[in-house]
Amino acid sequence: MREQLLDAGVKHIDAVLYTHAHADHSHGLNDLRSLAYHMGRPIDIYGNQATLDDLTTSFAYAFRQDEHAVYKRIAVAHQIDGPLRLGGIDVVPFEQEHGFGATTLGFRFGAMAYSTDAVELDEAAFAALAGVDVWIVDCLRYEPHPTHAHFERTLAWIARVKPRRAVLTHMNQALDYEELRRRCPPGVEPGYDGLVIEV
């Protein structure tokens, strides 16, 4: 994450929303350190209680307020228990099934939504996604997987939600970018590191 923040010239973050605490989604937390120091304050971190419990245990030093500590606090944890407003943007969280009883949070930001690490979406999730214009959505690989949506399932979700633009994310190494791009129907595209989406 550090390199992506540097490449994008990011110098300020209003908040960080965590979908869940799995390593591939949470272990960049320490990379927020330089931003927190630059901004002169800890960064507000949002997640459900299970995610915050994992983060504050695994990265206790990042949340600990101790003026004598070597590492100064870089994050303040906030539990998501419903819609909220951050940096002037309305955020609507919704639960997603991640397989084997695990759940993640998807997020809707006005006309845009972000849904990764999901293998099933319930009716409440589809209701939260209704009318979305841009949807960044999970698509791990072509074959079914027990914890992530695969290409066919993702396309079925997109057909139901009907966003103007859908961007596939969380793709594994088996998906060749150009081949996947060719297989995508109009309005659907694979994402890539550094992609900027105007909303």
What role is predicted for each listed range?
Residues 122-199:
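Binuclear metal-ion centers of metallo-dependent hydrolases, dominated by the metallo-beta-lactamase
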Residues 1-115, 181-199:
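Binuclear metal-dependent hydrolase catalytic cores
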Residues 99-104, 110-138:
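Active-site-proximal loop/helix segments of hydrolase catalytic cores
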